[in-house]
Amino acid sequence: MYRIVLGKVSTLSAAPLPPGLREQAPQGPRRERWLAGRALLSHTLSPLPEIIYGEQGKPAFAPETPLWFNLSHSGDDIALLLSDEGEVGCDIEVIRPRANWRWLANAVFSLGEHAEMDAVHPDQQLEMFWRIWTRKEAIVKQRGGSAWQIVSVDSTYHSSLSVSHCQLENLSLAICTPTPFTLTADSVQWIDSVN
């Protein structure tokens, strides 16, 4: 089972949470995203299982819960990928101009990824950049790695993992799963509010 849920940080961060959870939220700029992620999780799973953190800081359910999840956010958008199949990774990005995106692609993309960029019309290369970027991030996050490892990932390499991508209006969403799964717009659930 794979479940993909998307929502808005600004809405979900104000949603009711199970007792004591709001008090665990960090202070500062990460607070709203943290609260929105916990709201998505508690809306999707009730009661919300205990959450622990891996070596690189990746949140996970305690070992006695046979479920895995990953959260990602970009701007006001947040995504949750939930699985009972094994470790998962997801990445969401708002497709937007970035001053140094070509330089960044040259620095971290593999030859195969560069070939994908070169295969599309120049007007579509920014979208392709975000498609490749989100795939790479999803793979790194599935492994529980850090963003610094993105340069060592080739999203065109066919491994035992399944990597799938979907563009949803101005959003680029990619997931990495341990078993085959094809991400489509129909497989995504949008949450407007949580009561």
UniProtKB/Swiss-Prot annotation:
GO MF: holo-[acyl-carrier-protein] synthase activity; magnesium ion binding
Reaction(s) catalysed by this chain's protein: apo-[ACP] + CoA = holo-[ACP] + adenosine 3',5'-bisphosphate + H(+)
GO biological process, alphabetically ordered: lysine biosynthetic process via aminoadipic acid
Keywords: Transferase
Keyword Ubl conjugation: no
Gene Ontology cellular component list: cytosol
EC primary class: transferase
InterPro entries: 4-PPantetheinyl_Trfase_dom (IPR008278), 4-PPantetheinyl_Trfase_dom_sf (IPR037143), P-Pant_transferase_sf (IPR050559)
Enzyme nomenclature, EC number: 2.7.8.7
Family according to the record: Belongs to the P-Pant transferase superfamily. Gsp/Sfp/HetI/AcpT family.
Job description of the protein: May be involved in an alternative pathway for phosphopantetheinyl transfer and holo-ACP synthesis in E.coli. The native apo-protein substrate is unknown. Is able to functionally replace AcpS in vivo but only when expressed at high levels.
Name of the featured protein: 4'-phosphopantetheinyl transferase AcpT
Native species: Escherichia coli O157:H7
